[in-house]
Amino acid sequence: MNRPVHNEHRRKRFAKKCPFVSAGWKTIDYKDVVTLKRFITERGKILPRRITGVSSRFQALLAQAVKRARHVGLLPFVGED
């Protein structure tokens, strides 16, 4: 039997480099709201690694920084409509 080939239509994924590693960052500061806003959606959700290209270490630090900024009041819990 001939199987249909579905792999021809798949897009090639390019390896994204972590922007924090490329810039030489060691930690992420929760008070740096401008940087944190680049990694959250309009609704206030943290973007996943597959979209942002952030490494696993910095994704954990990013999530922790966003949550701290929310509790302090620098970022909203719910996005701005």
UniProtKB/Swiss-Prot annotation:
Keywords: Ribonucleoprotein, Ribosomal protein, RNA-binding, rRNA-binding. One of its GO terms (molecular function) is small ribosomal subunit rRNA binding. Pfam families: Ribosomal_S18. InterPro entries: Ribosomal_bS18, Ribosomal_bS18_CS, Ribosomal_bS18_sf. It comes from the Bacteria. GO terms for biological process: translation. PROSITE patterns: RIBOSOMAL_S18 (PS00057). One of its GO terms (cellular component) is cytosolic small ribosomal subunit. Belongs to the bacterial ribosomal protein bS18 family. Part of the 30S ribosomal subunit. Forms a tight heterodimer with protein bS6. Binds as a heterodimer with protein bS6 to the central domain of the 16S rRNA, where it helps stabilize the platform of the 30S subunit. This is Small ribosomal subunit protein bS18. It comes from Chlamydia muridarum (strain MoPn / Nigg). The lineage of its organism: Bacteria, Pseudomonadati, Chlamydiota, Chlamydiia, Chlamydiales. The gene is rpsR.
